[in-house]
C-alpha cells in the first residue's frame, strides 16, 4: 500500500498512461479501456488517499485526465443553472431556486484550472491563450461557456469562467402564470400579438426570464405556422412538438450560429437572419441580439416579417436605444435614424426582471408609435407595481400586483385587425381605447 495525495497519484498515472496507452487519451472510442487501464494501475500501486475508495479514486483520475475535474459532476446536474469560477480556488454554484453555494473543492492550481477550461472550450473549436485571453464556447447538451484568463485577469487567479447550463423544458402560459411572472390577460395579449404579426422584443438582464417567456409565446403558435429560430452556440428555444409516435407535429426550423476563430468557418447570427427570409417564415425568432445581427433583425421586421427576440437592456425606450446602438455596428446611419427604425421594427417592448426574492416578473409592457413626422409616442400597457419589499430571517419577500395601465393604441389595433384577429378577441384588449386617447 502506498499512502500519497491525489495530485501525486494523478501525475504518476498520467505518466504511465502516456507512456503505454497514449491513444486511449485522445481516442474517445477507447475511453472505456482507459478507465480499465487506470484501475489496474491504481490497484497495482495500492494507492491510499484520504477521502477516496479505490473506485472513487479511479473515477476522479479518469475525470482529471479526459473529463473536467471538479466541474464534471455539476455539468450534468438538472438543478444547477450556473457554475461560476471566479478564480482557480473559488467556485460558486447557482441553483435553479436561486441559491448560491461555494463548492468545498477547487482546482489544484491556476494552471490546472486553465488546462481544464481549455478542454471545455475544445469541444466548440475555441482557443484561449495569452494571445486570445477571452473565449466563448459551448458543450453538447446546451451548455454555454465564457472564459477570461490573464492578462485580462490576475496571473495568480488563473482563469475566470461563467458556465451556464440550459435545461430543455416545455414552458407554456400556465407555467408562467402559476409562477407569478405574468397574468393570464398579459399572456393572452402577448400571444395574440405574436400570432398576428406584431414584432416584439423582450428586454431585461441575464437570468430575468427573457428566453423562458419567449419559449412560452412561441409555443402558443399554431402548428401550421412556420417558425425559424436563430441562436448563438447553444440551444435555448425548444419548440419542436412530437406526438406519442415521435412524429413532428409543428413547423419549426432551428438554427445555430457557429463562432470560429477561423473566419472561413465562422457562421454569424447575422448570416442566419438573412438566410431565414428565404425560408418563408411566419415568425423569425432571434434568441438574443447582441451584435450586428440587430440590423438584420430590424430590416426583417421592417420588410413585413414578424420578428421576436431578446436584448439585454432596460424597459421601453432603453431597449430601442440598445438595439439602435447595435445596429450602428453594421451601418453608421446616425443614431436618430437607427433609433427610429428600431422603434418601427419592434412596436412592443416587454421588460422582464428578476426580483430579490428570485421571482421573475413581467414588470412593464410598452408600446411605441412613430408618427409620420418621426415623433415617438410611448405608452405603458401593463406594469407590475411593487407594494412591499421585506427582508426577514435572511429571505426577501416581495409583494405587488399587475395593472393594466392603457389599452393598445388605435394604430396597433388597426394592425391586428388587418392581420385577422377575431373581433371578439381584439375587443378584450382594445375596449376603452377611444376614452383613453381622449384623455
Enumerate the predicted regions with their spans.
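N-terminal accessory targeting/assembly segments
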Residues: 1-128
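P-loop NTP-binding catalytic core
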Residues: 90, 94-196
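Switch/coupling sub-region of P-loop NTPases
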Residues: 198-200, 216-343, 353
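Hydrophobic anchor at the beta1->P-loop junction of P-loop NTPases
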Residues: 202-204
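Walker A (P-loop) phosphate-binding loop of P-loop NTPases
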Residues: 207
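NTP-binding/hydrolysis catalytic cores, primarily Walker-type P-loop NTPases
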Residues: 361-439
Amino acid at each position: 500500500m502506498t499512502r500519497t495525495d491525489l495530485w501525486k497519484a494523478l501525475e504518476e498515472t498520467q505518466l504511465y498512461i502516456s507512456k503505454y496507452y497514449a491513444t486511449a487519451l485522445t481516442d474517445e472510442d477507447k475511453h472505456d479501456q482507459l478507465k480499465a487501464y487506470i484501475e489496474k494501475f491504481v490497484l497495482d500501486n495500492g494507492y491510499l488517499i484520504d477521502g477516496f475508495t479505490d473506485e472513487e479514486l479511479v473515477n476522479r483520475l479518469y475525470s482529471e485526465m479526459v473529463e473536467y475535474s471538479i466541474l464534471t459532476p455539476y455539468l450534468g446536474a438538472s438543478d444547477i443553472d450556473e457554475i461560476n469560477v471566479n478564480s482557480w480556488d473559488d467556485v460558486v454554484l447557482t441553483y435553479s431556486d436561486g441559491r448560491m453555494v461555494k463548492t468545498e473543492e477547487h482546482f489544484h492550481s491556476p494552471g490546472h484550472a486553465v488546462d481544464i477550461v481549455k478542454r471545455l472550450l475544445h469541444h466548440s473549436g475555441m482557443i484561449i491563450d495569452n494571445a486570445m485571453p477571452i473565449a466563448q464556447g459551448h458543450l453538447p447538451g446546451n451548455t454555454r461557456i465564457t472564459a477570461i484568463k490573464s492578462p485580462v485577469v490576475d496571473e495568480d487567479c488563473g482563469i475566470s469562467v461563467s458556465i451556464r447550463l440550459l435545461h430543455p423544458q416545455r414552458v407554456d402560459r400556465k407555467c408562467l402564470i402559476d409562477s407569478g411572472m405574468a397574468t393570464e390577460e398579459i399572456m393572452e395579449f402577448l400571444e395574440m400579438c405574436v400570432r398576428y404579426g406584431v414584432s416584439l422584443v423582450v428586454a431585461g438582464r441575464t437570468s430575468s426570464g427573457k428566453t423562458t417567456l419567449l419559449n412560452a409565446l412561441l409555443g402558443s403558435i399554431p402548428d401550421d405556422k412556420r417558425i425559424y429560430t436563430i441562436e448563438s452556440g447553444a440551444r435555448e428555444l425548444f419548440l419542436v412538438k412530437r406526438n406519442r409516435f415521435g412524429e413532428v407535429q409543428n413547423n419549426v426550423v432551428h438554427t445555430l450560429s457557429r463562432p470560429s476563430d477561423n473566419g472561413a468557418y465562422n457562421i454569424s447570427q447575422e448570416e442566419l437572419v438573412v438566410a431565414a427570409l428565404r425560408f418563408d417564415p411566419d415568425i423569425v425568432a432571434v434568441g438574443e441580439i447582441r451584435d450586428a445581427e440587430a440590423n438584420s433583425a430590424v430590416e426583417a421586421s421592417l420588410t413585413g416579417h414578424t420578428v421576436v427576440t431578446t436584448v439585454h437592456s432596460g424597459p421601453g425606450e432603453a431597449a430601442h436605444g440598445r438595439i439602435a446602438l447595435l445596429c450602428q455596428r453594421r451601418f453608421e446611419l446616425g443614431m436618430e435614424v437607427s433609433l427610429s427604425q428600431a422603434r418601427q421594427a419592434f412596436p412592443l417592448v416587454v421588460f422582464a426582471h428578476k426580483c430579490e426574492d428570485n421571482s421573475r416578473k413581467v414588470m412593464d409592457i410598452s408600446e411605441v408609435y412613430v408618427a409620420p413626422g418621426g415623433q415617438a409616442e410611448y405608452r405603458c400597457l401593463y406594469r407590475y407595481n411593487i407594494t412591499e419589499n421585506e427582508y426577514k430571517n435572511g429571505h426577501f419577500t416581495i409583494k405587488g400586483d399587475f395593472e393594466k395601465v392603457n389599452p393598445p393604441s388605435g394604430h396597433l389595433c388597426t394592425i391586428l385587425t388587418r392581420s385577422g384577429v377575431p373581433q371578439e378577441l381584439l375587443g378584450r384588449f382594445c375596449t376603452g381605447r377611444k376614452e383613453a386617447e381622449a384623455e
